Amino acid sequence: MWYVTVVPGNTTTMTFFLIICSCLAWGGLGKPQFPDQEKDPLFWNTWAQHTLKNALTLQKLNQNTAKNLILFLGDGMGIPTVTAARILKGQLSGQSGEETQLEMDKFPFVALSKTYNTNAQVADSAGTATAYLCGVKANEGTVGVSAAAVRSQCNTTQGNEVTSILKWAKEAGKSVGIVTTTRVNHATPSAAYAHCVDRDWFSDGEMPAEAVQAGCKDIARQLFENIPNIDVIMGGGRKYMFPKNQSDVEYPGDKKHFGTRKDGRNLVEEWTNRMKNKKAQYVWNKRELLSVNPNNVDYILGLFEPGDLPYNLERNTETDPSLTEMVEVAIKILRKNPRGFYLLVEGGRIDHGHHEGKAKQALHEAVEMDRAIGRAGLITSIYDTMTVVTADHSHMFNFGGYTPRGNTIFGLAPMLSDVDQKPFTAILYGNGPGFKVINGLRENVSTLDYQGTNYQAQSAVPLRMETHGGEDVAVFAKGPMAHLLHGVHEQNYIPHVMAYAACIGQNRDHCMSSGGASSLSPALPSLAALLTLTRLLC
């Protein structure tokens, strides 16, 4: 790394420093600023015409009934994160990045989702999860309960429970699954099965005694009791399933990973005993997961860490499965059901990376989730599978500074501040732990490894943890009825659309009247007509 001492007022030094900044920004790309072909108007006109033709084909809507539903949820994946992840994906494959397409970019329908909670302008992941899973907006910090419930007040739970699309799918005879890179009892997945007035009640060990005595149940317990026989459960959170002080199978000597349950229950053992007459398997590492034969397993419980799974950049590739690997196994198990499936997939550690001000971690998590989206697309069909990709909320993350084409996404802007005469990175946070002042002056980032894995990007306001952002987030959709995600929507609209596409929940009857068939079906028209007639007569 180059280190340059900048002397205020010294024009020669300043000029030299700008040259060094430019070299740092462009180092390793080995490419012109942009491809020669982009200088020719024909390139852009041809591309636009190609895109136009693709858009015109969308007039022929896919109105099939969705046999399968997949929701990919990028926790904290605001639009700036999507854009930066796109550039990173391209740069990882040797491109300049901006022209790259994420898998989600290829989805034909895009909408915006308004993320506020009923009591919060800037949302948290619990209230938002209740919206996009249960179909109703809710208060921050609560999961699976309406806005009539008050956070941490146990006595406001009963009577205010709301059910999720995962439950609607299960009741319709579909297989259902949850895959996450966080704890399986974290905010996002918990709204799929739990009714809890506090997202932090992971086990009874985190609950106040009065709440336990009043009959409120911890989230881990609800995972196994509220919706019996969830077909696929994969993620972290192992310690919340075991008795307090029981050592962990992977980290037996580390007390911070010991069990947390005060009631002495071993929820994994209980699950194993309950499922012993079914084709069920418990796994806790990558080797065990990848040795699973989906044809011989109908139910799987995979708990790969005591807490959250490691960041993708830091995971042990020999022992820790990637999100893509978990998703592939999940779909291969779930798709055996002739009635189809519902799968919730969370790229949960995008959010954690941003909270820590570690943009590199966050963006690599987003790229990995996009990889999982691509894998899911390869093993499902657009004709019978509705796939939606969205975020629960955004973050105080952005990038700018007039960076040139192909600038490494983690690099410096091509200029100095005209206030303190110091360089700055393209990526910055509005608030967070990256605020650092040395001798009353902003830290000189050129003296740091600003492209390091755990570098904390500079922020405008000092906070121990960076906060969420309040702007709308994107919704990408493909498959049956994806066109119903088409404008600016309240976040709670999402599960209603997905349920309508699959004829489940409140919308289970509409297929009986409409037939739910489309000319987009790959089946013969006569077969489609026969299926429609069967639905009308039966």
Whereabouts are the PLM-identified features?
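Extreme N-terminal flexible tails
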Residues: 15, 19-57
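Glycine-rich phosphate/pyrophosphate-binding loops
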Residues: 161, 166, 171-191, 506-510
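C-terminal GPI-anchoring signal of eukaryotic secretory precursors
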Residues: 509-525
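N-terminal secretory signal peptides that target proteins for export/translocation
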Residues: 1-10
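Hydrophobic residues in beta-strands of the RecA-like P-loop NTPase core, especially within AAA+ ATPase
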Residues: 71-74
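His/Cys-centered metal/cofactor-coordination and adjacent catalytic loops
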Residues: 144-159
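A post-motif C-terminal structural segment
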Residues: 35-52, 61-67, 77-83, 87-130, ...
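Cleavable N-terminal signal peptides of Sec/SRP-targeted secreted and luminal proteins
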Residues: 11-30, 524-537
